[in-house]
Amino acid sequence: MVTLMAIAIAIASGKGGTGKTTISANLAVALAKFGKKVAVLDADIAMANLELIMGLEGKPVTLNDVLAGKADIKDAIYEGPEGVLVIPAGVSLEKFRRAKPEKLEEVLKAIHDLVEILIIDCPAGIGKETLIAISSADGLIVVVNPEISSISDALKIIAITKRLGTDIIGAIVNRVSNESTELGVKAIETILEVPVIGVVPEDPHVRKAAAFGTPLVIMYPDSPAAQAIMEIAAKLIGAKYEAQLKKKKESFISKFIKGLFGRR
């Protein structure tokens, strides 16, 4: 069991579309639900969207302002769901152009001092911001989809992380639909040579929650994906948690047949 306290965790992926930001946001809220003081920072200063998932879009001061030397980090911290401290990157192209990514390491250290757990939502791929975030973090979680192209891209992230000397916590396999073409957990662990610390199923509730700007674990806490994320959060801090999935409602026809013939 992985147990993490007072740590900065970089969450990265080899390519876009894995659901990395959704995992970052909801994992932060899930950890807060367990009573931890948590912050989540959007290090994807070019393609920021963490603020949309956390319901904090349009904030006047963002990480890009801080990286441009136009604001202090304390002014770019906002309280989000479950008391999670959120540092949005902002969506302004003008502010992005002024931002200096090399200041990110300094910012991360300042935020880390305020909380028990800092979640860093890295940009997809292996760009400058990702490398800075990973090197500044205590541990890495790589988010993958159960397909060979996603796993192949994740190998690059893992190799660079090892070279940077940052610990690798493990992988989260996201958007699993159990199709025959998908790679299984054992195969993924064999290829990546890191443990899979959680499997999050494909779940229509994820898009619904995002559309309302509310984290999944708050809006649909009983959904399969939310329960999987809560289990991952519990594993990270060494807490006990049992998934409480609602049973599907029995159809009218099923009830009718049982009533007609009885259970055998």
Swiss-Prot record:
It comes from the Archaea. Pfam families: CbiA (PF01656). ATP binds at residues 15-22. One of its GO terms (molecular function) is ATP hydrolysis activity. Keywords: ATP-binding, Nucleotide-binding. Transmembrane segments: none annotated. GO terms for cellular component: cytoplasmic side of plasma membrane; cytosol. The keyword Chloroplast does not apply. Belongs to the ParA family. MinD subfamily. This is Uncharacterized ATP-binding protein MJ0547.
